[in-house]
């Protein structure tokens, strides 16, 4: 699981972003992390992977403090950021450099997802469009078969057919022993994917419910 405990974070001393956030996310779900721009969605994801650190409180992944960035934790979480910095290598070389960090990486699965996206591994990463780079990194993330797959605005830069392929490959990833968090403000792109919703605003947790729970609360019975 991913747990935020009494989580506090700010970029500047007098600009508090999170103050005492408590949130638990379980494997086996696809979470939609929703909120307006600047609400703190990206900050949460970056704290989960340990590239940012809480000012107090903690964030744990599978019981390990993410701020420690232990190899055992990093090998079980993959983060697809909104902005990608692609190295000047071809895709095959990228795989050789990065796959060893993920013990469960499957080249067969990577090639399968790349085929879904109609991309070839001979391509140079830095010469691809932003949308194509996202597809490569998503294919790599799926192929890592980590416990957690975190994505920040993953459908930005994708055309309609690519968004359809995105939904297909993400659906293939989910299992009881894996979890997915998708941060977005384009809910239409993921509404058929997610089974749970987390809404934050100005660093506060407004909602953390499954779609089933929400549906049950909104349902009504016809009265004869």
Features from the language model and the residues they span:
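ABC-family P-loop ATPase nucleotide-binding domains
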Residues: 79-136
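The feature captures the beta-strand-to-loop junction immediately N-terminal to the Walker
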Residues: 31-36
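Helix-to-loop junction immediately C-terminal to a conserved catalytic motif
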Residues: 49
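Catalytic Walker B motif of ABC-type/P-loop ATPase nucleotide-binding domains
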Residues: 149-153
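Conserved ABC transporter NBD signature motif
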Residues: 57-68, 72-73
């Amino acid at each position: 699981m991913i747990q935020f405990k009494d989580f506090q974070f700010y970029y500047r001393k007098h600009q508090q972003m999170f103050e005492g956030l408590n949130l638990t996310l379980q494997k086996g779900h696809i979470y939609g992390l929703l909120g307006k721009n600047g609400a703190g969605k990206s900050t949460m994801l970056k704290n989960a992977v340990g590239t940012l650190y809480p000012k107090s409180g903690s964030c744990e992944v599978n019981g390990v403090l993410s701020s420690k960035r232990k190899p055992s934790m990093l090998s079980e979480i993959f983060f697809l950021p909104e902005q990608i910095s692609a190295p000047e290598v071809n895709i095959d070389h990228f795989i050789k450099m990065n796959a060893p960090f993920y013990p469960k990486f499957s080249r067969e699965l990577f090639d399968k997802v790349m085929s879904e996206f109609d991309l070839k591994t001979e391509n140079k990463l830095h010469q691809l469009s932003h949308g194509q780079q996202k597809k490569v990194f998503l294919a790599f993330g799926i192929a890592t078969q980590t416990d957690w797959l975190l994505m920040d605005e993953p459908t930005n830069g994708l055309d309609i057919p690519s968004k359809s392929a995105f939904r297909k490959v993400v659906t293939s990833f989910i299992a009881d022993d894996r979890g997915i968090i998708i941060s977005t403000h384009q809910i239409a792109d993921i509404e058929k994917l997610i089974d749970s919703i987390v809404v934050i605003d100005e660093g506060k947790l407004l909602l953390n419910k499954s779609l089933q729970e929400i549906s049950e609360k909104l349902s009504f019975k016809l009265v004869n």
